[in-house]
């Protein structure tokens, strides 16, 4: 249910873009994101910090897109989010005791420290690549192409990378935890 709530605003954004335009879609994205936060609060009595942070960026960049009638703002939001994820992962890798990935998953999964560090760097590089790819597609290809890339390309790549990460984790897990 949680993953559906996270994915729903993106679906709403895509549908409203196809039915109307990027400006109406940006407004719908803001509303759908707010509703997803409210439903998350009602169901789980908590809202994750990452969800609040993402909503803040959606609200800021979506509002700028609508107010200034410039779709570049909503396009930049994607790269900024990926860039901040990259920086957070790299910061944790170099300056914290535990990599961020280990902090997020380490309570449920036991892995050697080197595995956590590799996984952390892999995700940082993945987010960096996605952010750079978004810049290219958003500003050198058509808006329709960017929308399809954002919804299907980036979502598909993230799902694939999550699956590959799961395989990597499974291979390194202690036998008694598999």
UniProtKB/Swiss-Prot annotation:
Q: Which GO terms describe its cellular component?
A: plasma membrane
- Into which family does the record put it? Belongs to the YciB family.
Q: Which residues cross the membrane?
A: 22-42, 50-70, 76-96, 121-141, 149-169
In its keyword annotation, does this UniProt entry include Protein biosynthesis? no
The source organism is: Erwinia tasmaniensis (strain DSM 17950 / CFBP 7177 / CIP 109463 / NCPPB 4357 / Et1/99)
Q: Does the keyword Membrane apply?
A: yes
Q: HAMAP family, alphabetically?
A: YciB (MF_00189)
Q: Please name every pair of cysteines joined by a disulfide bond in this record.
A: none
Q: Which PANTHER family match?
A: INNER MEMBRANE-SPANNING PROTEIN YCIB (PTHR36917:SF1), INTRACELLULAR SEPTATION PROTEIN A-RELATED (PTHR36917)
Task: Recall the taxonomic lineage recorded for the source organism.
Answer: Bacteria, Pseudomonadati, Pseudomonadota, Gammaproteobacteria, Enterobacterales
Name of the molecule in the record: Inner membrane-spanning protein YciB
Spell out the Pfam families in the cross-references. IspA
